[in-house]
Amino acid sequence: MPEEVHHGEEEVETFAFQAEIAQLMSLIINTFYSNKEIFLRELISNASDALDKIRYESLTDPSKLDSGKELKIDIIPNPQERTLTLVDTGIGMTKADLINNLGTIAKSGTKAFMEALQAGADISMIGQFGVGFYSAYLVAEKVVVITKHNDDEQYAWESSAGGSFTVRADHGEPIGRGTKVILHLKEDQTEYLEERRVKEVVKKHSQFIGYPITLYLEKEREKEISDDEAEEEKGEKEEEDKDDEEKPKIEDVGSDEEDDSGKDKKKKTKKIKEKYIDQEELNKTKPIWTRNPDDITQEEYGEFYKSLTNDWEDHLAVKHFSVEGQLEFRALLFIPRRAPFDLFENKKKKNNIKLYVRRVFIMDSCDELIPEYLNFIRGVVDSEDLPLNISREMLQQSKILKVIRKNIVKKCLELFSELAEDKENYKKFYEAFSKNLKLGIHEDSTNRRRLSELLRYHTSQSGDEMTSLSEYVSRMKETQKSIYYITGESKEQVANSAFVERVRKRGFEVVYMTEPIDEYCVQQLKEFDGKSLVSVTKEGLELPEDEEEKKKMEESKAKFENLCKLMKEILDKKVEKVTISNRLVSSPCCIVTSTYGWTANMERIMKAQALRDNSTMGYMMAKKHLEINPDHPIVETLRQKAEADKNDKAVKDLVVLLFETALLSSGFSLEDPQTHSNRIYRMIKLGLGIDEDEVAAEEPSAAVPDEIPPLEGDEDASRMEEVD
């Protein structure tokens, strides 16, 4: 039974907190939390809920607002009293509500929240468990709640968290309707009385609450006034103070005459300090996403974007939409101008899309809301259907969220397509976020086709401009069945590559893919617009050819068959096979890879991975094919030499040298570059006419025991067969 104490006419009742609530308060008061600021968010959120309730009731019964039409939240710091007061004109609480809601009936979330806290959850999740009010004790030693409901008298609730609270009828200043929460702050929490700190917390957590939040501050300003004005001021001030105590009014008898007679004289002035109450609305940026997109200017979107992201630049593009029907939500999505430096740092929590439920902020890093490849998109999603107390675990299972995610991805792709029509801006977008689009092609099979339309590449015919795959297809020759591409390190490198010689000479366009992620992208993007994507660096490249060309190719195959066999014998396991090439024009040979193996570029990328899987490296790298150019004089002369004497040591040496050089020109790395270099140096010496034996005789100390013997040496040939 509550204790009853009689204070004159006032009846004060004391109640014990329900055990779980007492335990929760003890936990809040006695544990150190770094982000105490969330108490303000919780109290504002509660005020907003109370305002939502009265607004909802007034829809069916407008007279409910007779006790106060204005729906608002006021914040009043009082440094002299060390109190921070929050006032709302919401629905208020009856005496029974006050006793039940603030202490005697535990919410279902109380126990769950304590368990979560003890398991390491953040205190900021308190609101999700419906016990946000108690976060006031993070900063306050005593809390007083004065409340007035339309159906009851005005009551005051008070507690210093000692296991009990009191409730009494309140005969102080009438508040009309709503709730006033007065926090008596702890000595070390006075920062929440500072204008800067309150504004900072409201901006961070509550700037998009749907009701005006006004900060009331007592300020001083200097006022310059003439002496006679000073007298007037004094008179006015005394008039104002008359309510408090009767004071004689000062009259300036004859001041008018003095004024008139002294018009030409310079008036004496003095500065006085006057106190005034400054009112500032802290959330002027109303939830912009709830408004009609047609009524919002680009400047307003820009302001909202900057306040949301703290970016100093304007956004590049914006998509504002709402979805209605079985599911209702609104979203406002922005593309920034630049990619953040840590765009693909997985360990860093991204807070790009803020999730609201009916205008109340829920969380700012909701991974389930958007796929990773769109992690650069900034904005807000406001759902009407999700429950307010939703937790991260529930989000992962939520069907509603899956539908929202699907819609967001769809709208993002629409936004990119719209942006693609503006060449200048799309160029900026593509420079910043092309990796994301390519990652999307790798990961998102559903939207792969739409994403592929957004890709832009340099090609052998596009010059300095980048071109889309659609434009490439529109320029294809009638006989051309495939889209030809080459991957590599730079545009210059791939443009001068031996692989593109014949393709370009025949007038076919080649797409230049020069980013490491392109390799992953084309593994998934097998075709575009019904045309298969074919790498010019892999085996089986088929170029459209007429009967004459086919006949010539057959003749070359027969003519060079023996040389191919010999080269395969010499190179042994280094290559899978040696064939005649249909892709070379001016280069003597090149190394191609098998259709499903890695390209040279992919091999380079994989070797650079710090955490690579060596077992995969083995079988993906192994398949190399040497292709020789039948029209090249080096190859023709080598064929003649081999036919004259297939055991000629020079032939073996030249075959290995050709192979190693082809490895380099095809983008591979050598396993033993030193041996290759020594061979080249010998060739240079031969070219310069330097006698190897003379040099060795002059510098006996420099002779290394296992130095490579002269080019024609027997040993050298056998040694070269072992070297890759």
Swiss-Prot record:
Annotated region (Interaction with TP53), positions in chain: 1-527
Coiled coil, from the record: none
Site feature Cleaved under oxidative stress, where: I126, G127
GO biological process assignments: cellular response to heat; negative regulation of proteasomal ubiquitin-dependent protein catabolic process; positive regulation of nitric oxide biosynthetic process; positive regulation of transforming growth factor beta receptor signaling pathway; protein folding; protein stabilization; regulation of cell cycle
Modified residue annotations for S-nitrosocysteine: C590
Chain intervals for the UniProt region annotation (Disordered): 222-270, 695-724
Modified residues (Phosphoserine): S226, S255, S261, S307, S445, S669, S718
Molecular function terms from GO: ATP binding; ATP hydrolysis activity; ATP-dependent protein folding chaperone; nitric-oxide synthase regulator activity; protein dimerization activity; receptor ligand inhibitor activity; TPR domain binding; unfolded protein binding
Record-listed N6-acetyllysine modification sites: K435, K481, K624
Gene3D superfamilies registered for this protein in UniProt: 3.30.230.80, 3.40.50.11260, Heat shock protein 90, C-terminal domain, Histidine kinase-like ATPase, C-terminal domain
Keyword Hydrolase recorded: no
Bias (Acidic residues): 225-244
Keywords: Acetylation, ATP-binding, Cell membrane, Chaperone, Cytoplasm, Glycoprotein, Membrane, Methylation, Nucleotide-binding, Nucleus, Phosphoprotein, S-nitrosylation, Secreted, Stress response, Ubl conjugation
Residues annotated to bind ATP: N46, D88, K107, F133, R392
Activity regulation text: In the resting state, through the dimerization of its C-terminal domain, HSP90 forms a homodimer which is defined as the open conformation. Upon ATP-binding, the N-terminal domain undergoes significant conformational changes and comes in contact to form an active closed conformation. After HSP90 finishes its chaperoning tasks of assisting the proper folding, stabilization and activation of client proteins under the active state, ATP molecule is hydrolyzed to ADP which then dissociates from HSP90 and directs the protein back to the resting state.
Region (Interaction with AHSA1): 215-552
Record-listed Phosphotyrosine modification sites: Y301, Y305, Y484
Glycosylation sites recorded in the entry for this protein: S434, S452
Short sequence motif TPR repeat-binding: positions: 720-724
Residue numbers carrying N6-succinyllysine: K219, K531, K577
Pfam family, one: HSP90
Post-translational modification Phosphothreonine, affected residues: T297, T479
Family per record: Belongs to the heat shock protein 90 family.
NCBIfam families documented for this protein: PRK05218.1
Notes concerning its domains: The TPR repeat-binding motif mediates interaction with TPR repeat-containing proteins.
Protein name: Heat shock protein HSP 90-beta
Organism: Equus caballus (Horse)
